[in-house]
Amino acid sequence: MPARPKRRIRLDNDERRAQLLQLARTAFSDRSYDEVSIDDLAREAKISKGLLYHYFPTKRDLYVAGLREIADELVLKLTSVPTDLAPADRVRHSLDAYLDFVTDHSRAYVSLLRGGIGSDPEVNAVVTGVRKRLAESFVVGTPLEPMLAGKPAFETAVRGWLGFVEHASIDWLENQRMPRAQLRDLLSEVLLAIMRVVAPQLLS
């Protein structure tokens, strides 16, 4: 007696969208944007291309949605850090949370920061937005928080430091030049040095 064909599992809209985003995130992390095929994604999801396009009208829409999800997860990781810590302790705990994400989702992290479809306004907006939210997350709950919006020099310095964090984290992922704890301490000391210059009275 021939085996019965396996029935496809019907997912509700939210489950299907989540499935497609996860497949896309993996694909775009492993391959370049141009190498990712909608046909392959639909085949892997066991749905038609038409149904995939119902959720995401273009490959670019799917790519951008995946980036937004990665950005939200990264910011959420930092918001889990207690806010009732001394500034130096909060910086170190926040960096630990950040590096946890970098370690656990290395491909997604690199994909978020390096992009893959050239200069795209929507992708640039996602990256700019997550950088702003991360800068705020690193100082939220500390006496330095109001200064991020109220003191332009501090805002510029923190965002410049965040760029250093991004490049140092990717270099660490790719080359492992130092232990993770040493990287955390290096990044922490650089930010604390910035704070001492901009607002020494708040760290005394």
Model-derived segments and spans:
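Hydrophobic alpha-helical connector segments
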Residues: 79-104, 147-151, 184
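Amphipathic alpha-helical linker/stalk segments
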Residues: 66-93, 138-142
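Short, hydrophobic secondary-structure boundary micro-motifs
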Residues: 110-113, 181, 203-204
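N-terminal intrinsically disordered/low-complexity leader segments
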Residues: 1-15, 201-204
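Hydrophobic/aromatic residues within well-ordered alpha-helical segments
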Residues: 16, 59, 66, 70, ...
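Helix-turn-helix
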Residues: 19, 23, 27-61, 65
